[in-house]
Structure formats: structure tokens, C-alpha cells
């Protein structure tokens, strides 16, 4: 049965005598559904005439060579109205089993003579304990009607099957007319036939639809709804027709949809008195077939009232609102449906709502909802959507797709006993993910929570900030998300149970016959919530905590800076930080010597250097080395003899006088030698590279400068030799630091004058050298 074109958003209304039923023709809507034949013209033979008159077969329902009768097909989705008083309560199990059942009515203008030899119509009436379930009560028909006789009926299987597993048994409408005939011989009037699409008892489920839904793709598989047709003149045209049906716990308020009439009635047929003879064709499901999830998006939001059964365990999945800012990682929801968090101004689920969901799951509060929620309540609470427990209704998949794309709050109901579907209402797997098929068994019956997407992304941003120590990179994004999502209270955090990543993977496994959601669920523990960094008062970004390695470095720098401030005044050579310390000499000792902090020690060292240098000026290097060696030996031998004589006189045994020095370890290890060699290699290599660059004139200006320096050194060498220059350097090292500390102001003034004079001379020289001026600029 093909879907009719788009339907108007209007309630059911009875037709007037001169118009089609329910206002289809009255408003000028004329259309021919797919698979139906065009309107019958005058003079054409009526459908059903002959031996096979009135036989509703699968060929006749779809398409075939036989002409279709002027039949109006109508499908209505209604809320729960009060069951008529005349309806026997013993027939209510059929209605209870088919909560939200879909009624499709075929209204024909042709009446047929009764045929005694025609086969009975199966599934006309549901017989339950000797009572009859009719589609309409006498009050609904507007005229008192007698009780209908029992009609034998069986559950047909395999005669006619559709794609959704719905079966129909063809039968003759004349038998229906004969059985349901009015005692006043009104069989010549127009008969109203019904096709009742209901579920078997094992397919019970909670069907929840929202008010104001305009279904653009009407199909017999799209909705679980009820249809009731009324005779003309019973109600006002603008009043919604009362519908038959009864729900046990939930009152659903749905919007009716209409199929336009196929045929245009003639004036003669309009003048005929119409009496509806209700006939019900029961279509049963052969089993819930496995149906793959579809990615259809319903533009309208559905507001559903979720009332779980006592044997269900809710799994509430909370997600943060989406961020449409350019800097946000999370893309906005696809489609035209706004998320519930966006409709509330980026709200989030509070503690009261979580507790309310727990109470509803335990069956502590069950309320009958006969109308949509007020605007105030809808604004205070996030809109909760539910999916039907039966996998044969594709409209639930539309709700899933729209909700999964929008990132709304999700409430999942997982049944603890999915096999007990015959004793109680089926506890289907209600979720908003792309999940369908049999409900998965929960890991445990306790309540399980997982915080999705935005909350986890905010945590990842904070962790990245801590690792990179760059608080400014996330100052615009992380605080905004933290303000949008208020922190949960400790009581709620205690109730939240940690959900592992394997659990999130199971819910989206291919065994559920559903595609994986675009955004995976990441587990989130209360410990992570408590460890969230607080935003600073400056730029609003979380204050990063420096790692331990970075905390140790400032301590080492503080130790090195606690030494003398004069250490920074003497710049070390290139790569001085790579120079390993000497065994008996380090940087601190050198500073102490140069600043005369230990006068005795500094005097001895300074005198020794002066003696050595002056000796070299008078004698050769070989003579100086020999004399120094003889002087050292004479001193040590004399001291050794003196100590030996003293011990002999005093009759003491103190041992060797240089025993402490002899036991002192002065050997260099292989590692120390390697360090000194590497340091020396660094200096040698850098010197060789610089000399090669200067002598090979890589830069003409630098080579000319080096040439001028060498020319000046020729005059210095004529006046001083190397030892004299070395002696002057040693004297300057031990005298200039002390003089500069004592007369720093005067020294700085004179140094400024000298620097200015030198710059003037250099400028004059560069002006005379070709190419030097361009290089300076």
C-alpha cells in the first residue's frame, strides 16, 4: 500500500451530506494515491460487479487490471479518548494489546446486494469470551444500533504480506454487509469498510507520539495510530472526531492524518442516504523483523511523555549543549531540528530531574497525561524523546536520527527481563542513538550515567592546557563551556556510576543493527570533575600547574644565582656551559681569587704568577722549568728531613709529613678526560671555522677588519713581547675587578667617553673602505 501525498495538519471532522467524509472533498483536496486507479467516470462498470464482486484481495488492494472502486482510504493517528460506555469492557484486551494501533478505513460509495454463498470475512470482529469488539459504538454512530452477532474469525497468516510483516486475509465485503446489516433494510445504502491494523498480544509496547507532528511521508508503517470514521452530521465540522481505544497507563495525544479521496462522487450518489456499516479487517504481524536504522530527519520536534514500566531500569545519558562558536570543536546539530539544550538556552540536566527519572523508573509516580505539557514546564525541563519498543515502526527511527544528531539529553530504558513480554508491557529499549533490533542486556541493574561530548571535550581542552602550559590558547573556549554547564552536586556525583569504554562500545556494536554515532561516548568519572582546574581571575583560563621537571629547574637556577652577582659580569667564552669543572678549581674559587675575598690565598697565587712570568722574561722556558723543579725539590726534601729529625728527638711516630697529600686522589678518569677533550675540540673547531671564513674572504668587510687588526698587532709586537702582554693581563685580572667595584661611577663615565671616541674612529674608517658603509647600513 503506497503512501499518499503530503497531508494537511487538521483534525478529524465528519462530512456533511454533500461532501466527502472528514472534509476531504469539502476542502477541495483531490488526489489519487499511488497504486490506485483514476476516478471512475459515469458509465463505466462498477468495481466488484460479477462473480467476484466485493472480494478484497491483495491484487485489488495494490494494483491490477481490474478497476478500483471509488474508495476513500483514510489513516488517522489519534490520542486516547474515553472508551464509549456502550463498548463492552470485555473487548478491551484487543485495544490494550494494540495501544496506538493504526486504523486505515476504506470508504466506498458502491453498495452490493447480499450474496449468500460468499465466504465469511475473516478478522471482522475480535471475539473475546463471547463478546464482540466493534470499531464504533452506537453513540459514535449517532443512531441506536443493535448488538452485532458473533462472527467466526481466525488469525490469518501468509495470505497477504507487506514489507513490514503485516498480513491481510482477503474476503468479500458482501458478507460483511450481510452480517452487519441493519434490521431496517439499509443494506442498499453506502457501506463503510474498515481495515484494522493491530498487533498481536505479544507485540505490546508503549507508543508515544507528540502533538503537532506533521508526517510528510505517510505509510502504513510510519505510525502506530488509531482511526475512527464517523457518519455525516454527527459532530461539528471543526471538532475532532472521538476515537476508539484505551491505553493502560499513558494517554497519548496525536494528530490525525488524512488521505484524500480517490473518486469524485456524482450528484446522485450525494443524495443517497449514507449508513456506515463498520467492518474491521485485522492485520496481524508475523513477528518483529530485524530492521536496519534509517537516517531520516523529522523537521518537527516531538514532545513525548515517557512512563517506564516497573520492570525497567533507566539509563540516563546527559549531554552538554552544543557550541556553535567558530572556536568550538563540536559541530552544530545537523538538520532543522533544534536540540533541547538549545531551546532552553544551553541548559543541562539538574539533580532534581535525575532523581525524578529514578523515581519514575521505580514506579513511584505514574501520572496520566491527556494533553501536551504546558509551555512553562516545557521550558523548565529538557524535552525527552523516546523510541518505540517495537522495531517495526520506522517513525521511531526518525526520532532516533533527529535526536542523535541534535545531541539532546537521552534517557534509555533497559529491561531487566526482556523475555517476559507476554505477562507485562514490553520493556523495549528506548534510546536516541542509532540503535534498533533486540534490546541489549544491561551490564548491571543499577543506574548508569555517562556524560557525552561537550563535557568531555572541555576536559580534554583543560588537560591539553595543563600539558602545554599555554593558558591563553583556551581562554575563549573552556570558560564558556564551564559556565554553560553548572557543576553537579556531590550527591549526584555519588549516584553516578562510572561507565567504562567497553560499555560505550557495546551500546554501539553492529549487533544492535544500528550505525555508530558520529560522536563516541567517552567515560567520565567524578574524580575527573573534582580535578578540573579553576579559572583564573585574569583572563578566565584555567591556571596551569607546572610539571615537576619545570619546578626543579627554578630551584637549580636559584642556587646558581645565590652565588656572587659578579659572576654575571665576567662573560664566559663560547660553550662555557659545556666546560667540565676542574678537580681542584671551579668558577666560584676563581671569583673569590679575583675579588680578593681571601687575601692570603689570593696573594700567594698572584705572587706565584708574577714570579713565573718575570722568570720567563729573564730566562728561557727550559731554564725556568729546571729552576722551579729544583726549588720545589729542595723545599720538600728539607721539610721531610726536618720532620724526621723532629720525630727522632721527640721520640714520636707521626709518620710521613706529606701523608695527606700522598693519599689524595688526583687521577683523571676516562670520563673527565673525554669531557675536557670535547670542550677543547669545541674551541678548536670554532676557531678553525672562523679563520677559514676570514682568510677565504667569505665576507669582505670582516676580512678587511681582520686585516686591520693584524696590522695594529704588528705595532704592539714591536713594543711588547708575548710575556709582557701576558704579565699585563694577569695584573689586570687581579686589579681591575677590585678597582671597578670601588669606583664604579667614575669608571662608567670614562668608559662612555672611550666608547664614543672608538665609534667615531670606526665610522671614519668605514667611510674610507669601499663596501663597508653598505654593510653597516
Curated annotation (Swiss-Prot):
Modified residues (Phosphoserine): 13, 68, 210, 241, 325, 348, 350, 485
Transmembrane segments: 604-624, 706-726
Cross-referenced PROSITE patterns: RETICULON
Record-linked Pfam families: Reticulon (PF02453)
Composition skew (Polar residues), residue ranges: 393-406, 525-534
UniProt KW Acyltransferase keyword: no
Biased composition (Low complexity): 326-339
Topology in membrane: Multi-pass membrane protein
Region of interest (Disordered), residue spans: 1-77, 129-182, 198-245, 293-573
Tissue expression profile of the protein: Expressed predominantly in central and peripheral nervous system of newborn and adult rats. Low levels have been also detected in heart, adrenal gland and spleen. Expression of isoform RTN1-B is restricted to particular neuronal types.
PANTHER family assigned to the protein according to its UniProt record, in alphabetical order: RETICULON-1, RETICULON-LIKE PROTEIN
Primary role: Inhibits amyloid precursor protein processing, probably by blocking BACE1 activity.
Name used for this protein in its record: Reticulon-1
Organism: Rattus norvegicus (Rat)
Phylogenetic classification of the source organism: Eukaryota, Metazoa, Chordata, Craniata, Vertebrata
Name of the gene: Rtn1
